[in-house]
Swiss-Prot record:
UniProt feature coiled coil, ranges: 292-338
Disulfide cysteine pairs (residue numbers): none
Protein name (Swiss-Prot/TrEMBL): Putative ankyrin repeat protein L271
Pfam family of the protein (one): Ank_2
The organism of origin for this protein: Acanthamoeba polyphaga mimivirus (APMV)
ANK repeats: 142-171, 173-198, 358-383, 384-414, 477-510, 514-543, 547-576, 594-626, 630-659, 663-696
Biased composition (Low complexity): 244-267
Length: 728
């Protein structure tokens, strides 16, 4: 049964269904959040009440009935003024996709649709609106439709602005005269330009605004010169025509008689230049007052044909939707049947064996097919969940990995370590890295106490470069964080930082490219307490730098007797070590490990929400903008871990807020992607307030708002839409 053709109280059954659906708030919210829409922006022009077919519309998704009379016209910015007669507000239009019964069509070169997402609103009466539209690509100079439209609407300020930037004033005069907007003509004409005055007078005579035309001829007679005679003749001819028409109407004749013009002016034409390339020829004739029956019949027949064409199109689309829906339902049932069969067989096998499952092939089959129901059953029967996670990793099934970690509490750290030591490490390198990223976001260094264990991730090359390198020092300086702290310290003010760095396992005997150690830099800064601390830890004060100086020699050169006494109090049982290059040496390795360890410290501090630790590391001169192996910055990590204070600290320290990782994702995208886990509204709002860009695309061609639509966080979604509307 075709529901479109069965009417009830003036409505089709489908109209009634759509009304009920639209009134359902849950369904409306689902559409707003879930319905993808085209990224291409169109426009439409609405009246002052913003109604379509007497139905109010507003920002967001607007759904009309499928009846062809209830539709909205839209088009590109440079075409919309050509096809729209009247209006006050220009609206952004986006087309929803993947929504059943959405359609669009083109009739007489105009585009129509029954569903739109309305965006930003522009007031076409204001001149500043056109400044924005020109920035969006509106051509107001070569396209005369814009100036013609504003003059027709009698928008004086807008028309004057367009003329001031080069729009065609003659087109404005013609349009204003045609639609009787005489005050607009008076406000835009230039009293010193003969060509403009001549155009205005001819247009007003042609459109029978005879009183104003006569007044203008009188005022500008000196400027018009010899043209006055021709204009006066044209004016008198049209005056007689008007009087003749009035006389005919007053005689009570049942039919109006077409007034006759003199031969001289019957086909009077006014030529108006358009951008030196085209000419508008206005042939003004008196219109017939009646339309013949034949023309009315023809128009009616045309309208019926259009209606039938749309009706056929509607039926075709409905059939397609029904066929596609049926195929999808059949496929879902088929998959459910297969899944139930597998689960039943597995349960039967478990029941018969009555023992714990040890068949790895069965587990692998469930993992490869990503059958989470089967895996749940296996776990309930006592199968080792960490072994399932291990098998999921070597089979590169990331959906299963996420499910086991997020929902079943699998020990991902244990499995990660097992993978690093196994033969599968290089074969499944991408999965191992994926697990490492999960460890980073879940405080992977939280229980680590051994420096070698901290550095293990760096040795596996998950991070190509250190996240923190001293600022103000080039890469060639090769200074470790402890060296930086000692060099920057004055009166031992960095002692606490040095102690913290030592506690994290930095090598106090590392040497830079000029052969100096942390002790050399501490002596240069006369930091007695730091020197005492380093010597107590066994720092080697016998190292010579490239100039042949030991730390003690530097103290002697500076005549610092207090430091000399300090060095002389240390037992002299060590041999002076000559200077050496650090390239390809153990010191170079230690230095690189120290710098990589700095990255681990920062990540650990973020994961543990240790604001003060991150602050101290940044104050010591670490570069906040470097990236790890996945091209993530500290800001990415702080956003994922929902640390607002650390996010604020990093942004205020100059980190790139729109930096993209190897998947093309920005910190804003990650905040949107993980917003279902905990509320990240404050972080999203802070990022947006600091110029985070919404429309940057990741490598999968998705933006932050696309990722947001999958998490059902309505507050963040509305915030993104609001900012997007303001910025565009």
């Amino acid at each position: 049964m075709d529901i479109i053709h069965h009417f009830h109280n003036g409505q089709t059954i489908f109209d009634i269904m759509m009304t009920r659906i639209i009134n359902n708030r849950n369904f409306q919210r689902m559409i707003d959040l879930e319905a993808p829409h085209t990224k291409q922006c169109y426009f439409t022009i609405l009246n002052e009440q913003e109604t379509i077919s007497n139905v109010p519309v507003g920002t967001g998704l607007c759904v009309f009935t499928y009846h062809p009379q209830n539709r909205i016209s839209f088009d590109e910015l440079n075409r919309i003024f050509k096809y729209t007669n009247d209006g006050v507000y220009l609206r952004q239009v986006f087309l929803p996709t993947h929504i059943p019964r959405h359609y669009k069509c083109r009739i007489n070169d105009q585009q129509y649709t029954n569903m739109v997402i309305l965006g930003k609103r522009y007031d076409l009466r204001k001149s500043e609106t056109y400044i924005e539209l020109i920035q969006l690509g509106l051509d107001v100079i070569s396209d005369v439709n814009v100036i013609y439209w504003t003059s027709k609407q009698n928008y004086i300020d807008a028309t004057k602005y367009l003329i001031s930037i080069g729009a065609n004033i003659k087109t404005a005069i013609y349009s204003a005269s045609k639609f009787g907007n005489l005050d607009l003509i008076i406000s835009i004409i230039d009293g010193k330009n003969k060509d403009i005055i001549l155009t205005a007078v001819k247009c007003m005579i042609a459109d029978y605004h005879l009183d104003l035309a006569k007044e203008m001829i009188s005022i500008y007679s000196e400027l018009l010169g010899t043209e006055v005679v021709e204009l006066t003749t044209y004016l008198e001819s049209n005056s007689k025509l008007v009087k003749s028409t009035k006389s005919t109407k007053s005689s009570g004749s049942p039919k109006s008689i077409k007034p006759k013009k003199s031969n001289q002016n019957n086909n009077a034409k006014i030529n108006v230049s358009q951008n030196d390339n085209s000419t508008i020829c206005f042939d003004k004739k008196v219109q017939q007052n009646e339309i013949t029956v034949d023309k009315m019949s023809s128009a009616k027949e045309q309208a019926l044909n259009v209606y039938k064409e749309i009706e056929n199109m509607e039926n075709f689309i409905l059939n397609k939707i029904n066929i596609t829906k049926k195929k999808a339902l059949d496929k879902i049932k088929e998959i459910e049947n297969i899944e139930n069969t597998v689960v039943e067989k597995l349960e039967d096998k478990i029941t018969k064996s009555n023992v714990s499952i040890t068949n790895t092939d069965t587990i692998t089959q469930a993992i490869i097919s990503e059958n989470l129901n089967s895996l749940d059953l296996l776990i309930r029967q006592g199968y080792d969940i960490n072994k399932i996670l291990y098998l999921a990793c070597i089979n590169n099934k990331k959906n299963v990995i996420d499910y086991l970690i997020d929902n079943k509490g699998a020990n991902y750290e244990q499995v990660h370590k097992q993978l690093l030591d196994s033969k599968h490490h290089y074969k499944n390198d991408s999965t191992v890295k994926y697990l490492a990223k999960i460890i980073m976001t879940k405080s992977q260094f939280e229980n680590v106490t051994d420096t070698d264990e901290i550095q293990q991730v760096s040795k596996k090359h998950y991070f190509k470069e250190p996240i923190h390198i001293p600022l103000g020092l080039g890469k060639d300086d090769d200074l470790s964080p402890i060296m930086v702290a000692c060099r920057a310290s004055k009166n031992d003010d960095q002692l606490d930082l040095v102690k913290m760095l030592v506690s994290y396992g930095f090598n106090i005997n590392s040497r830079d490219k000029i052969g100096r150690s942390a002790l050399h830099y501490a002596v240069n800064g006369s930091n007695r307490k730091i020197i005492e601390y380093l010597l107590a830890l066994g720092a080697d004060y016998s190292f010579r730098d490239n100039n042949g100086d030991t730390p003690m020699m530097l103290a002697k050169k500076s005549n610092n007797l207090e430091l000399l006494d300090l060095f002389q109090s240390v037992p002299k049982d060590t041999k002076t070590i000559e200077p050496k290059k650090v390239t390809n040496t153990t010191d170079k390795t230690n230095l690189n490990q120290d710098i990589k360890t700095a990255m681990s410290i920062c990540l650990s501090s973020i994961n543990d929400n240790q604001f003060e630790s991150v602050q101290k590391l940044i104050m010591s001169g670490f570069n906040v903008s470097s990236k790890d192996d996945t091209k993530k910055t500290l800001l990415h990590m702080a956003v994922v871990n929902n640390n607002l204070r650390i996010v604020e600290l990093l942004i205020n320290s100059g980190i790139n807020i729109n930096s993209q990782d190897n998947l093309g994702k920005t910190p804003l995208m990650l905040a949107c992607q993980y917003s279902h886990r905990d509320s990240k509204l404050a972080i999203v709002e802070f990022l947006l307030n600091n110029n985070a860009k919404i429309l940057i695309k990741a490598k999968n061609n998705m933006t932050a708002i696309d990722l947001m639509s999958k998490t059902y966080n309505n507050n963040i979604y509305n915030l993104l839409c609001e900012r997007l509307s303001i910025n565009h």
